[in-house]
Design a protein with these regions (language model features):
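Short, non-helical or kinked segments that cap or interrupt transmembrane helices
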Residues: 58, 78-93, 134-136, 218-228, ...
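A residue-identity detector for tryptophan
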Residues: 36, 47, 59, 87, ...
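N-terminal signal-anchor module of multipass membrane proteins
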Residues: 1-77, 187-198, 203-214
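Early transmembrane hairpin of solute transport permeases
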Residues: 42-46, 50-119
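Hydrophobic core segments of alpha-helical transmembrane domains in multi-pass membrane transport
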Residues: 40-48, 65-71, 113-121, 142-152, ...
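Long hydrophobic alpha-helical segments that form multi-pass transmembrane helix bundles
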Residues: 3-8, 137-197
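Membrane-interface helix-loop-helix junctions at boundaries between adjacent transmembrane segments
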Residues: 86, 91-168
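Helix-loop-helix junctions within the multi-pass membrane cores of secondary transporters/permeases
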Residues: 176-180, 194-209, 225-234
Length: 236
């Protein structure tokens, strides 16, 4: 596997190229094949996680992207996909989700690693099934696998659903008169941060900066998308 990573990473080879592959995987959550974008994303994840008192989310993200990427090499999938970070983006989301919704136990970390590895295999399967229609699975492997694990966790003592909310109807939004522009700006940035389940406006800034570094259009449309979603909620 190490030789494969060295060949796909470029002339330098070694662990530095593998780190770049992991960062590209993080950036691919928002379709950016850039290690620098992934670095800013990872900084945003760690900042927001520790700021919210959930630092384990950052380490979960790091473990998830590593396990899912290594799994791709172990399964012998095309190295080009690995070089572009396409094995890592589902894993990093799994790594953010598990510590967010479940308590800190050994079984949670084992489940996180297993689910992250599973997303790489599930991604290949879904892509093969949908190939005739030229449809990519994108982050559906993360959604599907995480749903299965979280549903099962409610029946497992080793996977405490400490932070998982009970089903409830949505509450009414505050009246427009009580909303300040500063609050809207914070909500807007937090909406971008929530792509990785991080509730931090600073994280949102890091994500926008990472997008802008790779694609100004991607940053613009991410900003517009979050703004439109926020305005829709306020209007309703």
């Amino acid at each position: 596997m190490a030789n494969t990573i060295a060949r796909s990473g470029g002339a330098g080879g070694g662990s530095f190229d593998f780190i770049k592959i992991l960062l590209r995987g993080t950036g691919q959550v928002m379709f950016q094949n850039s290690a620098w974008t992934g670095l800013l994303f990872m900084i945003g994840i760690f900042w927001g996680a520790y700021a919210e008192g959930q630092g384990l989310v950052g380490w979960g993200a790091l473990l998830g992207v590593t396990v899912s990427t290594v799994t791709g090499y172990l399964l012998g999938f095309p190295a080009k996909d690995g070089e572009q970070g396409l094995w890592g983006f589902n894993g990093v989301l799994v790594g953010c989700a598990f510590p967010t919704f479940m308590g800190n136990t050994v079984w949670m970390w084992l489940a996180l690693a297993l689910c992250s590895a599973l997303t790489t295999w599930v991604r290949a399967g879904f892509n093969n099934v949908m190939a005739p229609w030229k449809v990519n699975s994108f982050t559906f492997p993360f959604v599907f696998c995480t749903w299965m694990f979280l549903l099962a966790a409610r029946a497992m003592h080793g996977l405490p659903t400490t932070h998982m909310a009970d089903p409830a109807l949505p509450a009414a939004f505050s009246s427009l008169e009580s909303i300040r522009f500063g609050d809207l700006a914070v909500y807007w940035l937090k909406g971008i941060g929530q792509v990785f389940l991080i509730n931090s406006w600073v994280t949102g800034i890091c994500f926008l900066a990472g997008l802008f570094l790779c694609s100004r259009w991607a940053a613009l449309w991410a900003a517009i998308g979050s703004a439109l979603a926020l305005l829709t909620v306020v209007a309703l």
